[in-house]
Structure formats: structure tokens, C-alpha cells
């Protein structure tokens, strides 16, 4: 009873602890979710900031690059402006602040239109402005990087999670408690006897040894989980506090950085002045061109107005004479006064400011002057384009030049006004040149297509359709006079839809202007909304900041409450630990008192329990094995079914894939031939695709490698030259230093010899004094009476001895120092000699490498030019520039003498004699040779080569996509037509799988059956027993096999066995193994068909079959007998010629088609059907006299249905 009550109480306490743990885990999860939401919001703001900063940084980097370019080159450009001559009669040119210099000279330089002081002042100010702007951008970048790093650190920081696994512990406690409760109820139900008492004792011992300790351990673990949950909750609160504080700091920094990015702007008048320096050449040239344009327009207006006035005056005079003549004739009947004929008066209005007179030669001279200046390539190109536009006709003139193009007489009359003859001639000449270029391109394409058609006719049938139906039928080379006449006629026409198109364009412009105004209003409205939203966001941020402060205060209060609760729980925990220790001691005493009595019973129970567990484990293993086997069997069945379905799908996909491969193979072969005209086409499709990819990649990589190699070679050659000069200067300095050190070494050696001499003298003096000193000491020791003088002498001698010893030490120290210096100088001289040798070796190595690099560059240029020639390009020099063109265009350009004088095919290969530039005798000669070598390399522009290659590859890609699209269209058309024609009766171009109607021929002797046809005779049926043709009038069957045969009567005459029979031989005696089973003429091609009946059960009695055959009887009238003519020799000559033509034809030489060829030929049936239709129509339109002669019409042509 006590155990049950104790277990129930412990279970209730564990449940309370479990609820407390769940509450703490929920609070921890709530805090973690709140932190996650705050971090996600921060990440969103930081991501927006980084995006905005990336855009601002891109803009700032581009601006800084432009500024650096302007700062690096404005002085050079400004100096160049001083060398470019310019006129001074353009007072409106220049900045408003530019002072006007009074000078009598009419010409000056472009620098006169600029203020020199202002330009220099702007150049000095621009450096500071650019550096200040760069520092501002760097500060913003550092701030954004710091914010992103702090945000990432917050995101990566680990957040404490709740405690898991408490549910299992609580379930274990409940299980043990229920076990104790059930055992208690079981004991109460047992009878009171000796056996029952023994069982009860064993049960109580089991509880004491197993259940109660397990229950205590689980309850202690639950208590530990409660403590862990409390610690994690406190840690989550602290982490949330730190995270929120850091998030608030980061957001405040983020707002500052956003304001800095918004204020990141650049406005400077200094750079505007510098940009004016760069733009001045183009602006001045544009003004010159505009002056010429305005002057020519004024002259044209004056001349056209005079011409118009003259023409109208002529019309007025003619009308006046006609009226006088009419009144003279009708004067007796009409009473009216002679009035003057109305006329017009042409006046020019709106005379503008008179611009200075500028001629075209001045513009050309100015452009040529700019070409000689460095860094003026871009203005020269733009000015050249503007100068070319002077001769370009206006839009109205281009329209009037085409007056007769789908126009009317009104258009012609309207275009005849205000259009000078020179303008008309120039427009017509331009149109003619364009049309000639177009015709030449068309002729080239036609020749290529004809060549492709010719090759297709001699090759095997293509795998993906017949492309011959797409070839144009225009002649390969039209007559030039006719073409010129057509182009001149078409150039005088005008489109009748031009006015409607202009109206539509005007309406479109008005509509677009209205949309533009609406969009501007919308933008203004959005700007206002954005400003209001920005203000509201600022207010919201302030509210959020105050809310954060309140939350922080609440968190601090909760933190104090949690500390008080933690201290209370720690006291309770100590009490529980003391109580648990007391209970453990009591249990130990009880267990020790009963341990000796129940030891044997425990061992037997333990053995039985082990056996029971083993039996349960084996049973569970057998059940699991059976379940796994059943599941594995079902899985195998499902897998087999899925594999079967998958195999069917894969077979369908394989058939479709093969069809697609056959269709795309021809397009890929054509693309490969265009990309590599001289190469051999691979057999399979992956090889073709890989070859095309390799060729295109090789072209691009080759271009890129050539460009990189040339750039590296130039840079390395410059670096090697600089290094070589530096090494030569270092070697010269080392020679001078070594000579100076040698002289110093000789001086030091002389001083050392002198010091050694002095040292020897001092040593001899020292020995003398020592001997004297020893003698004195001996005298003193022997007892001689010394006097004061003797003592003073002794003292003096001792002093001299000390001085000499000191001098000796100093001299020895100086000698050692001198010897050390001598050794140091020797080492320096040796090091300098080694350095000089190393420098000489480096110079020689650099020379060798420079020569190898030059040779490599030479080979690269040769390879690039050879590759251009292989691709069909030719390098042409025009106006001193290198242009890469197609060979056909070069031929067209060289057709006239003018183009021959201006352009010619040149070679960009460097001179091989320049490769030895590093072996010059003098440095000046080496510099000249190197510059000549670099100029020869600069003649080949890698950018032009890359553009040509890229354009060529893109053209090939466009052509491949076009052909692929056409192939898909033909494939769809073929599938659609095939599906439509599958259930229809074919009557021409028979192939395997077609449904054909077979009818008996009129040849009753051999009883032959032929397919009903239109323009496709000689398709005979191989009779089989299943057909039962003797009981039928017609047979509807599907063709399964086609055998192509040619009649050769020579074999039958030479002894071939005519009595051979086929397996499916008909009962009427027809042998299909004979050369001529149907008695056809010699050399005739015929076909033997195997067919299976499509709809069994054809009517055997006369019925609809007679109506079907009746037209055949009517249409097949003719005489089997040959019509004799008087000219027998002509007949024999005609027959032999026909026979030779049949035998020598390409179709007769072909053998029977294989099944694969028949399958491939199925894609060409549409083309053959169209050809057959056209042939039939042509033959039907001809008179009967044009039909074949009677000698060629034999019985084989009359035995059809």
C-alpha cells in the first residue's frame, strides 16, 4: 500500500514538473521566434541597402574612371588643341565665360576658343574634387561592409533551444507506476497460503531491485531536465536582450548610411571645363559641317525657286497663247474680255544669320589634320560619318526618287518638283549600287544552292527530308542590262501606302507624347507618395525605437522575477535532494536484509526471463523476415511492371529520337560544311555537333589567345627593355664602385704596412725598456742603496712602460680593425663581380627570351591571317586602315578602277628581318628596330579580327537555327501528311505502307494485276493464294514490299532459264523470277509489289467493281500491235537510242533499294508527288502529236487498269 501511494505521488510530481518544462520551452520558443522575426526584418533592410549601394557604387566607379581618364589626358589634349588650326570667325563657339581675344589674324587654333587660366584652374581643382568623391565612396563602402558583417554575425550566432525528450521519461514513469498498481491489485486478489506468500515475496523483491530504483532514476532525470529548461530559458532571455540591442544599433547605423547614399552626388564645374577640352575638336568640326550644310541648303533653295519660277512662267505663257487663240476663234460667238493668266511669285523668307563661308576642302583638311594627332580617333570617326551624311539624300528625296514604285502619275508629277537632276542621279546611283550588291549576294547564294542540289542529286537520299523544294527557280546569272533597267524602273516608283503610313506615324507620335505626359504626371505623383511614405517611415521608426525601449524595460523586470524564482527553486531542489538521500539509505537497509534469502530465486527468475526474451526476439525476427519477404515480393512485382512501362516509353522515345536525328543530321552537315569548307563531315551526329562546337570554340579561343599573346608580348618586351637598361646602368655603377673600392683597398694596405712597421719599432723599444727595468729590479733586489733619483727613474721607466703597453694595445687594435676592413672589401669586390656576371647572364637571357617572344608573335600573326583566309576572309587596306572582308566582297570592290586605287589586298605578316631587333650594335639602332617591329604588329588589329570571327560564328548559328526550324516544319508537315494519307488510297509515288487499289489488266493471257495510278504505271502485284484474285474484280491492299526491276531481253536471249517459277507463282503461268514476266519492252523499269489485304471480304460478284473498272477499260484503248512505218531504219535507230538512253540513265543503273533507303525516301514523297503533278499537267497541256511515238508505245503501257 505504501509503495503504491509513493509511486502515485511521485508520478503526480513528475507530471507537474513536465508541465513546467513545457511552459518554459514554449516561452523559449516564443523568444527565439521573436528574435528570428527581428533578424529577418534586419536582413531585408540590409539586403535593400546592399542593392542600393551596389547600384550607387557602379555609377560612382564609372564616374571615377571617366574622371581619371579626363585628369590623365586633359593636359595632352589641351596641348594638342594648340597645334590644330582653326578659324576665328565663329563668335558663338566656346563657353560663355571664354574671353574673346581681339586679333587681326583670321586663323588661329582651337585653344583660342578656351580660357587657358580657367582650364588650368579647373585641372587643379578637379584632382581634389575627384579624390574627395573617391574617399566619400570608400567611407560608404566600409560602413556598408561593417553593417553586413555585423548582421551576418548576428544571424550565425546560435540561439538556445528548448529541452526535448521529456515525454518519453514521463511515459516511462507512468508505465512503472501502473505496473506497481497492477501488482498491488494482483496481490490483493491472491489467497492467503504459503505458496502465495512466496510469490508475493519474490514480487516485492523484484519491485525493490528493479522498479523502484528505475522510478527514482527517471524522476531524477526529469528534475534535471527542468533545471536545464530553466537555464536555457534564462540564456534565451539574455541572448534576446543582446540581439535586440545590437539590432537597434545596426538599424541606426543603417539609417545613417542610407542618408549618405542618398546624398552621394557629384556636381563640379571643373570637370565640365575639362570635358569641354575633350569635346572641342568634335564641336568645331560639327560647326564646319553645319556651315557647309546650311550654305548648300540656301543655294539649293535659291536655285530651286528660280527653276520653279521659270517653269511656271513657261506654263503661264503657253496658257496665255492658248487663250488668245481660243478667243480669236470664238470671238464672234463669245463676248468676254481677255483676262490675264494667273501666275505665281516665289519669294524667299526667313533669312537667318549669315554663317561664315566654309568649303568642303576645309572640312577634309581639318579631318586629315585630326588624323595626324594622337588620341583623336573617335572625333575623326564621328566627323567622317557626319561628312558622309552631307551627300546622303533626305527622307523626302529618297521617297521621291522611287516615284514609280507602286505609285501613280500624281506621285511622279509631285516628285518632279523641287528635285534636281543631280539629286535624282545621285539617288538612282545609290539605289543601283545597293541593288547590285543585293544581286551579287543573291547570285552567290543561288550558285551555292545549285551546287548543293547537284551534289544531293548524286549522293544518297538525305536522312531528313528533301531540301530541293526550297531552292529558288530564278536564273543563276541574270542579264545585267535587264537588271539595271528593272532597278531604274523600280527606283522611280513610289509606294501608295506612304501617306497612310505617315499618318499612322503622326498619330503614333501624338499618342506617345500623351503617354509621356501621363507618365511624367505619374512619376511626379509617385515622388510625392514616396516623400510622404519616407516621412511616415521615419515616424514609424521612432515609434519602433520607443517600443524597443519599453520591451527592454519589460525584459529587465522579467529577468529580476526569473532570478527570484530560480533562487526559490534552488532551495526546493536542495530539500528534495536531502529527502531522496534519506529514502535511498532506507532502501539500502531493506535490500541488505532480504538479499541473502532471495538470491537463488532471483537467479532462476533471471534465467527464465532471459529465455523468454530470447523466444520473443526469435519470434519477432521470423515475423519481420516474413513481412520483409512479402514486401520485397510486392516491390519486385511493382518494379517489373514499372520497368515494362518504362521500356515501352523508351522504345517510343528511341524511335522518335532516331527520327529527329535523321532530320537534324542533314542540317548539321550543312552547318559543318559552311564552317569548315575543306574538312570532311563526320559520320554520326554527336561527332558533327562536337566538331561544330570545337570549330566555333577554336575560333573564339584562337582570337582571344592571339589578342592576349600580343598584349603580353608587347608588355613583356617593354618590361625586358626597361630591365635591360636598368641592368646596364647597375653594371656601370658596379664597375665604378669596384674601381673606387680597389683604390681604397690599396690605400688601406699601405696604411697597414706602415702600422706594422710602427708596431715593430714599438715592440723593440718595449723590449729595451723591459731589459732596463729588469736590470734595475735586480739591482734593487741585490741590496744596492737606492736614492731618490733612482726611485724617480724607476717610476719614470714604469710610466714609460705603461704608455708603451697602451700604445701597443692601440696599434694592435687598429691592425685588427684594418685587417677586418680588408676582408670586408675583398668580400664586396667578389660580390660585385658575381653580381656583374649575373647581370650579364640576365641580359643575355632577356635577349634570348625577347627573340623567342618576337618569333612567337610573328607565328601567331601568320596563323591568324591563315585562319582568316581559310574562313573566306581577305585583309584589305582602305584609307590606311585594315579592314577584314569576305573574298566575294573584295572581288566586287576591285571591279572598278576607282576601288582599285583606293583599296587593295595586303598582307599583315611582319617583316622577318625585324625579328633580330635585339642584336643591334647601338641602343639607338635597337630602339628603331624595336619600334619598326611594333609598328608592323600594330598593323593587324585584333579587335577587327575578333569582330569578323564572332560575326561569322553568329551567321552560322543563325543559319543553323533557320535550317533547324525549317527541318522541324518539314517534319511536322510530313507527319501531318503521312497521318492524313495513311487511310487514303495512293495513286502515285507508291511506297511501303501505302494503301493501293489493284485492278486486273486487259492482258487476259497472263492475268496480271496492277495498281490503280495516275502517271505512275508499271506497278504490278505479286499474286498470292490468300488474295484469291480469280474470284475478285478489285483488291484493296496495303503495300508491304516493293521490288524495282529493269527489263533486259538480252539475258533471256542468251540462254537464261525462262521456265523458273517463284514460290508464290500464279495459276495462270506468270513467273516472277523471269526477266520479263509481263511481256514489257526492253530497258523499261517496273515494280513488283507485295501487298496484304486491308479489308478482307471483298465482293466476289459483279457489283461496284464493274463501275470501278469501267473507266479503266475506256481509258486504256489502244492497239497492242506495232504500227509499221515505211522508214524501218528510222524505227530501229529510234528504238536503239531509246534503249541506250534507258540503260545509261542514272535511275536504271541503281540497284533495288534497300528497306532503309525506302524508309528514308518516305520524306521525299511530297516533293516527288509535286513533281509528278507538274509533269502530268505539262504532258496534259501538250497536243497529242507531242506524245511518244508508236514505236515506243508498247503493250506494257496498255496493260494498266
Curated annotation (Swiss-Prot):
List all Low complexity biased stretches. 485-499
Record-given protein name: Autophagy-related protein 11
Effect of deleting the gene? Impairs pexophagy and mitophagy. Does not affect non-selective autophagy nor the transport of ape1 to the vacuoles.
A single Gene Ontology CC annotation of this entry is: phagophore assembly site membrane
**Where in this chain does the entry annotate a coiled-coil region?**
418-452, 566-670, 710-828
Which residues fall in a compositionally biased region of kind Basic and acidic residues? 525-542, 1191-1201
Which InterPro entries would you find in this protein's record? ATG11, Atg11_C, ATG17-like_dom
Summarizing the function annotation, the protein's role is: Selective autophagy-specific protein required for pexophagy and mitophagy. In contrast to its Saccharomyces cerevisiae ATG11 ortholog, is not involved in non-selective autophagy nor in cytoplasm to vacuole transport (Cvt).
Keyword Transport belongs to the record: yes
**How does it sit in the bilayer?**
Peripheral membrane protein
Q: How does it assemble?
A: Homodimer and potential homooligomers.
Going by the UniProt record, its keywords in alphabetical order are: Autophagy, Coiled coil, Membrane, Protein transport, Transport
Write down the species: Aspergillus oryzae (strain ATCC 42149 / RIB 40) (Yellow koji mold)
Compartments in which it is found: Preautophagosomal structure membrane
Q: Could you confirm whether the keyword Coiled coil appears in this record? A: yes
List the biased-composition ranges (Polar residues): 97-109, 1133-1166
Question: What SUPFAM superfamilies does the entry give?
Answer: Tropomyosin
Q: Which family does it belong to?
A: Belongs to the ATG11 family.
Give the residue ranges for region: Disordered.
90-109, 458-503, 525-545, 1052-1076, 1115-1201
One record GO biological process: ribophagy
Task: Say which domain of life the source belongs to.
Answer: Eukaryota
Amino acid at each position: 500500500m505504501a509503495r503504491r501511494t509513493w509511486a502515485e505521488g511521485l508520478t503526480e510530481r513528475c507530471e507537474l514538473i513536465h508541465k513546467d518544462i513545457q511552459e518554459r520551452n514554449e516561452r523559449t520558443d516564443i523568444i527565439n521566434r521573436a528574435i528570428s522575426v527581428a533578424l529577418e526584418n534586419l536582413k531585408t533592410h540590409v539586403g535593400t541597402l546592399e542593392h542600393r549601394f551596389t547600384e550607387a557604387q557602379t555609377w560612382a566607379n564609372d564616374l571615377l574612371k571617366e574622371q581619371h581618364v579626363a585628369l590623365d589626358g586633359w593636359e595632352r589634349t589641351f596641348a594638342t588643341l594648340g597645334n590644330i588650326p582653326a578659324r576665328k570667325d565663329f563668335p558663338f563657339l566656346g563657353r560663355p565665360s571664354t574671353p574673346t581675344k581681339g586679333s587681326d589674324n583670321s586663323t588661329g587654333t582651337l585653344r583660342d576658343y578656351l580660357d587657358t587660366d580657367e582650364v588650368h584652374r579647373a585641372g587643379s581643382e578637379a584632382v581634389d574634387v575627384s579624390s574627395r568623391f573617391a574617399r566619400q565612396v570608400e567611407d560608404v563602402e566600409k560602413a556598408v561592409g561593417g553593417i553586413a558583417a555585423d548582421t551576418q554575425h548576428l544571424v550565425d550566432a546560435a540561439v538556445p533551444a528548448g529541452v526535448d525528450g521529456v515525454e518519453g521519461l514521463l511515459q516511462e514513469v507512468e508505465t512503472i507506476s501502473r505496473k506497481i498498481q497492477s501488482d498491488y491489485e494482483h496481490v490483493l486478489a491472491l489467497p492467503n497460503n504459503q505458496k502465495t506468500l512466496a510469490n508475493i515475496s519474490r514480487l516485492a523483491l523484484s519491485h525493490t531491485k528493479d522498479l523502484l530504483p528505475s522510478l527514482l532514476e527517471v524522476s531524477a532525470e526529469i528534475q534535471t531536465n527542468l533545471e536545464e529548461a530553466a537555464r536555457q530559458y534564462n540564456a534565451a532571455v539574455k541572448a534576446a536582450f543582446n540581439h535586440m540591442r545590437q539590432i537597434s544599433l545596426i538599424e541606426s547605423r543603417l539609417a545613417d548610411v542610407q542618408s549618405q547614399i542618398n546624398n552621394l552626388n557629384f556636381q563640379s564645374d571643373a570637370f565640365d571645363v575639362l570635358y569641354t577640352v575633350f569635346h572641342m575638336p568634335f564641336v568645331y568640326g560639327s560647326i564646319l559641317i553645319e556651315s557647309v550644310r546650311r550654305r548648300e541648303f540656301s543655294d539649293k533653295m535659291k536655285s530651286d525657286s528660280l527653276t520653279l519660277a521659270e517653269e511656271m512662267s513657261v506654263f503661264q505663257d503657253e496658257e496665255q497663247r492658248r487663250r488668245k487663240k481660243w478667243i480669236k476663234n470664238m470671238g464672234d460667238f463669245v463676248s468676254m474680255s481677255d483676262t490675264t493668266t494667273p501666275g505665281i511669285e516665289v519669294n524667299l523668307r526667313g533669312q537667318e544669320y549669315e554663317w561664315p563661308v566654309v568649303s568642303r576642302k576645309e572640312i577634309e583638311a581639318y579631318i586629315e589634320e585630326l588624323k595626324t594627332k594622337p588620341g583623336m580617333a573617335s572625333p575623326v570617326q564621328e566627323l567622317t560619318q557626319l561628312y558622309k551624311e552631307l551627300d546622303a539624300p533626305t527622307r523626302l528625296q529618297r521617297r521621291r526618287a522611287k516615284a514609280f514604285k507602286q505609285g501613280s502619275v500624281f506621285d511622279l508629277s509631285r516628285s518632279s518638283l523641287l528635285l534636281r537632276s543631280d539629286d535624282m542621279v545621285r539617288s538612282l546611283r545609290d539605289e543601283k549600287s545597293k541593288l547590285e550588291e543585293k544581286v551579287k549576294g543573291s547570285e552567290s547564294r543561288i550558285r551555292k544552292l545549285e551546287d548543293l542540289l547537284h551534289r544531293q542529286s548524286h549522293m544518297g537520299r538525305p536522312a531528313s527530308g528533301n531540301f530541293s523544294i526550297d531552292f529558288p527557280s530564278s536564273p543563276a546569272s541574270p542579264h545585267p542590262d535587264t537588271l539595271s533597267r528593272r532597278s531604274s524602273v523600280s527606283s522611280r516608283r513610289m509606294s501608295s501606302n506612304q501617306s497612310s503610313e505617315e499618318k499612322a506615324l503622326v498619330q503614333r507620335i501624338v499618342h506617345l507624347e500623351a503617354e509621356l505626359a501621363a507618365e511624367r504626371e505619374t512619376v511626379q505623383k509617385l515622388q510625392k507618395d514616396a516623400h510622404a511614405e519616407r516621412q511616415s517611415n521615419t515616424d514609424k521608426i521612432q515609434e519602433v525605437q520607443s517600443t524597443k525601449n519599453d520591451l527592454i524595460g519589460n525584459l529587465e523586470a522579467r529577468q529580476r522575477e526569473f532570478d527570484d524564482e530560480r533562487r526559490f527553486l534552488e532551495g526546493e531542489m536542495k530539500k528534495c535532494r536531502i529527502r531522496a538521500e534519506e529514502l535511498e539509505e532506507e532502501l539500502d537497509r531493506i535490500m541488505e536484509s532480504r538479499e541473502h534469502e532471495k538470491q537463488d530465486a532471483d537467479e532462476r527468475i533471471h534465467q527464465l526471463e532471459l529465455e523468454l526474451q530470447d523466444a520473443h526476439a526469435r519470434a519477432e525476427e521470423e515475423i519481420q523476415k516474413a513481412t520483409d519477404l512479402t514486401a520485397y515480393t510486392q516491390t519486385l512485382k511493382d518494379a517489373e511492371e514499372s520497368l515494362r512501362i518504362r521500356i515501352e516509353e523508351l522504345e517510343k522515345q528511341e524511335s522518335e529520337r532516331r527520327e529527329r536525328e535523321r532530320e537534324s543530321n542533314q542540317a548539321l552537315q550543312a552547318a559543318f560544311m559552311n564552317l569548315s569548307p575543306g574538312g570532311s563531315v563526320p559520320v554520326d551526329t554527336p561527332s558533327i555537333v562536337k566538331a561544330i562546337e570545337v570549330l566555333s570554340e577554336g575560333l573564339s579561343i584562337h582570337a582571344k589567345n592571339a589578342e592576349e599573346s600580343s598584349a603580353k608580348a608587347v608588355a613583356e618586351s617593354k618590361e625586358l627593355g626597361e630591365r635591360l637598361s636598368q641592368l646596364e646602368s647597375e653594371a656601370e655603377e658596379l664597375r665604378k664602385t669596384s674601381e673606387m673600392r680597389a683604390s681604397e683597398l690599396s690605400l688601406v694596405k699601405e696604411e697597414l704596412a706602415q702600422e706594422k712597421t710602427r708596431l715593430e719599432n714599438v715592440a723593440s723599444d718595449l723590449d729595451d725598456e723591459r731589459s732596463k727595468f729588469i736590470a734595475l729590479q735586480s739591482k734593487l733586489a741585490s741590496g744596492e742603496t737606492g736614492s731618490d733619483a733612482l726611485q724617480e727613474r724607476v717610476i719614470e721607466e714604469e710610466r714609460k712602460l705603461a704608455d708603451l703597453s697602451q700604445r701597443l694595445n692601440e696599434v694592435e687594435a687598429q691592425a685588427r680593425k684594418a685587417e677586418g676592413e680588408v676582408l670586408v672589401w675583398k668580400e664586396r669586390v667578389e660580390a660585385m663581380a658575381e653580381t656583374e656576371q649575373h647581370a650579364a647572364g640576365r641580359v643575355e637571357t632577356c635577349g634570348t627570351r625577347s627573340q623567342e617572344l618576337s618569333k612567337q608573335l610573328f607565328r601567331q600573326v601568320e596563323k591568324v591571317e591563315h585562319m582568316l583566309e581559310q574562313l573566306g576572309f581577305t585583309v584589305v587596306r582602305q584609307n590606311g586602315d585594315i579592314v577584314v572582308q569576305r573574298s566575294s566582297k573584295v572581288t566586287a570592290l576591285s571591279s572598278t578602277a576607282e576601288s582599285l586605287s583606293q583599296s587593295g589586298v595586303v598582307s599583315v605578316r611582319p617583316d622577318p628581318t625585324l625579328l633580330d631587333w635585339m642584336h643591334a650594335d647601338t641602343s639607338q639602332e635597337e630602339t628603331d628596330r624595336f619600334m619598326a617591329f611594333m609598328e608592323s604588329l600594330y598593323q593587324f588589329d585584333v579587335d577587327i579580327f575578333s569582330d569578323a570571327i564572332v560575326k561569322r560564328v553568329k551567321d552560322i548559328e543563325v543559319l543553323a537555327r533557320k535550317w533547324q526550324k525549317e527541318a522541324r516544319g518539314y517534319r511536322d508537315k510530313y507527319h501531318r501528311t503521312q497521318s492524313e494519307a495513311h487511310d487514303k488510297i495512293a495513286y502515285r509515288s507508291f511506297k511501303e505502307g501505302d494503301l493501293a487499289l489493284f485492278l486486273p489488266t486487259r492482258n487476259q493471257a497472263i492475268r496480271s494485276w496492277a495498281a490503280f495510278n495516275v502517271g505512275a504505271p508499271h506497278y504490278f502485284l505479286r499474286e498470292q493464294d490468300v488474295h484469291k484474285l480469280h474470284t475478285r474484280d478489285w483488291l484493296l491492299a496495303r503495300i508491304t514490299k516493293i521490288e524495282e526491276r529493269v527489263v533486259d531481253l538480252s539475258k533471256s536471249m542468251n540462254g537464261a532459264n525462262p521456265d523458273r517459277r517463284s514460290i508464290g507463282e500464279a495459276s495462270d503461268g506468270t513467273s516472277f523470277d523471269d526477266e520479263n514476266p509481263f511481256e514489257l519492252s526492253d530497258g523499261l523499269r517496273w515494280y513488283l509489289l507485295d501487298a496484304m489485304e486491308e479489308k478482307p471480304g471483298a465482293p466476289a460478284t459483279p457489283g461496284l467493281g464493274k463501275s470501278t473498272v469501267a473507266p479503266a477499260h475506256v481509258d486504256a484503248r489502244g492497239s497492242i500491235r506495232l504500227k509499221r512505218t515505211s522508214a524501218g531504219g528510222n524505227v530501229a535507230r529510234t528504238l536503239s537510242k531509246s534503249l541506250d538512253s534507258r540503260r545509261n540513265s542514272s535511275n536504271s543503273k541503281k540497284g533495288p533499294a534497300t528497306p532503309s533507303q525506302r524508309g528514308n525516301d518516305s520524306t521525299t514523297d511530297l516533293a516527288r508527288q509535286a513533281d509528278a503533278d507538274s509533269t502530268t499537267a505539262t504532258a496534259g497541256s501538250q497536243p497529242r502529236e507531242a506524245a511518244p511515238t508508236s514505236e515506243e508505245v508498247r503493250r506494257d503501257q496498255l496493260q494498266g487498269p
